[in-house]
Amino acid sequence: MNENGDITSLFDKRINKELVKAGKAIRLALFTENKSFEWPAWEILKETVDATPISITEDVKVTLCENGALRKTLCVEKRHDDSFFRQYIHLYEGVLAHRIDITNEVDWQSTNALLKAEFPLNLNNEVATYDLGVGSVQRGNNILPAYEVYAQYWADLTDANGSYGDSLMNDS
Protein backbone atom coordinates (compact mmCIF):
# COMPACT_ATOMS: atom_id res chain seq x y z
CA MET A 1 0.00 0.00 0.00
CA ASN A 2 1.32 3.47 -0.79
CA GLU A 3 1.04 6.68 1.22
CA ASN A 4 -2.37 7.41 -0.37
CA GLY A 5 -3.85 4.11 0.84
CA ASP A 6 -3.83 2.68 -2.69
CA ILE A 7 -2.91 -0.98 -3.26
CA THR A 8 0.35 -1.07 -5.22
CA SER A 9 1.08 -4.78 -4.89
CA LEU A 10 -0.86 -8.03 -4.63
CA PHE A 11 1.29 -11.12 -4.82
CA ASP A 12 -0.16 -14.59 -5.39
CA LYS A 13 2.24 -16.89 -3.54
CA ARG A 14 0.58 -19.98 -5.01
CA ILE A 15 2.00 -19.26 -8.46
CA ASN A 16 4.63 -16.60 -7.69
CA LYS A 17 2.80 -13.84 -9.62
CA GLU A 18 2.44 -10.10 -9.02
CA LEU A 19 -1.17 -9.14 -9.82
CA VAL A 20 -0.90 -5.32 -10.02
CA LYS A 21 0.76 -3.83 -13.11
CA ALA A 22 4.14 -2.28 -12.38
CA GLY A 23 3.88 1.41 -11.48
CA LYS A 24 0.08 1.24 -11.09
CA ALA A 25 -2.30 0.93 -8.12
CA ILE A 26 -5.73 -0.44 -7.31
CA ARG A 27 -7.44 2.77 -6.28
CA LEU A 28 -10.30 5.18 -6.50
CA ALA A 29 -9.52 7.48 -9.42
CA LEU A 30 -11.07 10.91 -9.77
CA PHE A 31 -11.67 12.56 -13.14
CA THR A 32 -12.24 16.24 -12.41
CA GLU A 33 -13.54 17.25 -15.84
CA ASN A 34 -16.53 15.09 -16.71
CA LYS A 35 -17.76 16.93 -19.77
CA SER A 36 -21.28 15.99 -20.71
CA PHE A 37 -23.83 17.45 -23.04
CA GLU A 38 -26.90 16.67 -20.92
CA TRP A 39 -26.62 13.61 -18.66
CA PRO A 40 -23.31 13.53 -16.73
CA ALA A 41 -24.18 10.36 -14.80
CA TRP A 42 -24.89 8.41 -18.02
CA GLU A 43 -23.11 10.26 -20.79
CA ILE A 44 -19.44 9.57 -20.12
CA LEU A 45 -17.23 10.66 -23.00
CA LYS A 46 -14.19 8.63 -24.03
CA GLU A 47 -11.96 11.69 -23.69
CA THR A 48 -12.95 11.83 -20.01
CA VAL A 49 -11.93 8.25 -19.22
CA ASP A 50 -8.80 8.51 -21.39
CA ALA A 51 -7.60 11.52 -19.37
CA THR A 52 -5.22 10.94 -16.50
CA PRO A 53 -7.25 10.79 -13.28
CA ILE A 54 -6.01 12.38 -10.11
CA SER A 55 -5.14 10.48 -6.99
CA ILE A 56 -7.16 11.25 -3.89
CA THR A 57 -4.49 12.40 -1.45
CA GLU A 58 -6.06 14.79 1.08
CA ASP A 59 -6.20 13.82 4.76
CA VAL A 60 -5.25 10.17 4.16
CA LYS A 61 -5.56 7.98 7.25
CA VAL A 62 -4.98 4.20 7.29
CA THR A 63 -5.89 2.15 10.37
CA LEU A 64 -6.25 -1.51 11.25
CA CYS A 65 -9.92 -1.70 12.25
CA GLU A 66 -10.31 -5.49 12.52
CA ASN A 67 -7.67 -7.96 13.64
CA GLY A 68 -9.34 -11.36 13.82
CA ALA A 69 -7.87 -14.82 13.38
CA LEU A 70 -9.45 -15.29 9.94
CA ARG A 71 -9.87 -11.70 8.73
CA LYS A 72 -7.90 -8.47 8.97
CA THR A 73 -9.48 -5.21 7.82
CA LEU A 74 -7.74 -1.97 6.94
CA CYS A 75 -9.75 1.25 6.97
CA VAL A 76 -8.58 3.91 4.51
CA GLU A 77 -10.10 7.38 4.85
CA LYS A 78 -9.38 10.34 2.58
CA ARG A 79 -11.02 13.30 0.98
CA HIS A 80 -10.95 15.50 -2.09
CA ASP A 81 -12.37 18.97 -1.57
CA ASP A 82 -15.78 18.37 0.07
CA SER A 83 -16.08 14.68 -0.91
CA PHE A 84 -15.15 12.04 1.68
CA PHE A 85 -14.09 8.45 0.94
CA ARG A 86 -13.81 5.48 3.29
CA GLN A 87 -12.63 2.06 2.13
CA TYR A 88 -12.57 -1.15 4.10
CA ILE A 89 -10.02 -3.59 2.69
CA HIS A 90 -10.71 -7.10 4.02
CA LEU A 91 -7.85 -9.64 3.92
CA TYR A 92 -8.53 -13.28 4.72
CA GLU A 93 -6.73 -16.37 6.05
CA GLY A 94 -7.46 -20.02 5.31
CA VAL A 95 -9.72 -21.09 2.46
CA LEU A 96 -10.60 -17.46 1.61
CA ALA A 97 -6.95 -16.31 1.49
CA HIS A 98 -7.18 -15.90 -2.30
CA ARG A 99 -9.93 -13.29 -1.88
CA ILE A 100 -9.86 -9.57 -1.04
CA ASP A 101 -13.04 -7.60 -0.40
CA ILE A 102 -13.13 -3.83 -0.73
CA THR A 103 -16.14 -1.94 0.62
CA ASN A 104 -16.47 1.72 -0.36
CA GLU A 105 -18.41 4.43 1.44
CA VAL A 106 -18.50 7.75 -0.39
CA ASP A 107 -19.98 11.10 0.63
CA TRP A 108 -19.99 12.59 -2.87
CA GLN A 109 -20.04 16.39 -2.96
CA SER A 110 -18.17 16.94 -6.23
CA THR A 111 -19.71 18.41 -9.37
CA ASN A 112 -18.73 17.78 -12.99
CA ALA A 113 -16.50 14.96 -11.79
CA LEU A 114 -16.39 11.20 -12.21
CA LEU A 115 -15.18 8.57 -9.74
CA LYS A 116 -14.01 5.15 -10.89
CA ALA A 117 -12.42 2.19 -9.17
CA GLU A 118 -9.27 1.21 -11.05
CA PHE A 119 -7.99 -2.36 -11.06
CA PRO A 120 -4.86 -2.36 -13.28
CA LEU A 121 -4.23 -6.10 -13.28
CA ASN A 122 -1.10 -7.76 -14.59
CA LEU A 123 -3.13 -9.88 -17.04
CA ASN A 124 -3.09 -9.71 -20.82
CA ASN A 125 -6.15 -10.32 -22.94
CA GLU A 126 -7.95 -8.10 -25.43
CA VAL A 127 -11.25 -9.67 -24.32
CA ALA A 128 -12.98 -9.80 -20.95
CA THR A 129 -16.22 -11.47 -19.85
CA TYR A 130 -19.00 -9.34 -18.31
CA ASP A 131 -22.31 -10.25 -16.71
CA LEU A 132 -25.60 -9.18 -18.25
CA GLY A 133 -27.87 -10.08 -15.36
CA VAL A 134 -29.32 -13.04 -17.28
CA GLY A 135 -26.13 -14.21 -18.97
CA SER A 136 -22.70 -12.97 -19.96
CA VAL A 137 -20.89 -11.48 -22.92
CA GLN A 138 -17.27 -11.41 -24.03
CA ARG A 139 -16.08 -8.16 -25.54
CA GLY A 140 -13.02 -6.01 -26.04
CA ASN A 141 -11.44 -3.80 -23.41
CA ASN A 142 -11.44 0.00 -23.80
CA ILE A 143 -12.24 0.07 -27.50
CA LEU A 144 -14.34 2.42 -29.60
CA PRO A 145 -17.27 2.72 -29.56
CA ALA A 146 -17.81 0.47 -26.54
CA TYR A 147 -15.31 1.83 -24.02
CA GLU A 148 -17.82 1.62 -21.16
CA VAL A 149 -19.13 -1.84 -20.29
CA TYR A 150 -22.35 -2.93 -18.65
CA ALA A 151 -21.01 -5.22 -15.95
CA GLN A 152 -23.34 -4.73 -13.00
CA TYR A 153 -22.35 -7.65 -10.78
CA TRP A 154 -19.10 -9.10 -12.11
CA ALA A 155 -16.35 -8.95 -14.70
CA ASP A 156 -13.65 -11.50 -15.42
CA LEU A 157 -10.26 -10.97 -17.05
CA THR A 158 -8.27 -14.11 -17.76
CA ASP A 159 -4.86 -14.25 -19.47
CA ALA A 160 -5.17 -15.02 -23.18
CA ASN A 161 -3.42 -18.35 -22.58
CA GLY A 162 -5.97 -19.24 -19.87
CA SER A 163 -3.31 -19.73 -17.19
CA TYR A 164 -4.61 -17.17 -14.69
CA GLY A 165 -7.60 -14.93 -14.19
CA ASP A 166 -9.16 -12.48 -11.77
CA SER A 167 -12.81 -11.64 -11.26
CA LEU A 168 -14.21 -8.40 -9.87
CA MET A 169 -17.57 -8.72 -8.16
CA ASN A 170 -20.06 -6.05 -7.09
CA ASP A 171 -22.92 -6.64 -4.68
CA SER A 172 -24.67 -3.28 -5.14
Functional labels for PLM-detected ranges:
Residues 1-106, 111, 117-118, 141-142:
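Catalytic and substrate-binding regions of extracellular carbohydrate-active enzymes
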Residues 108-114, 123-128:
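A generic secondary-structure signal for well-formed alpha-helical elements
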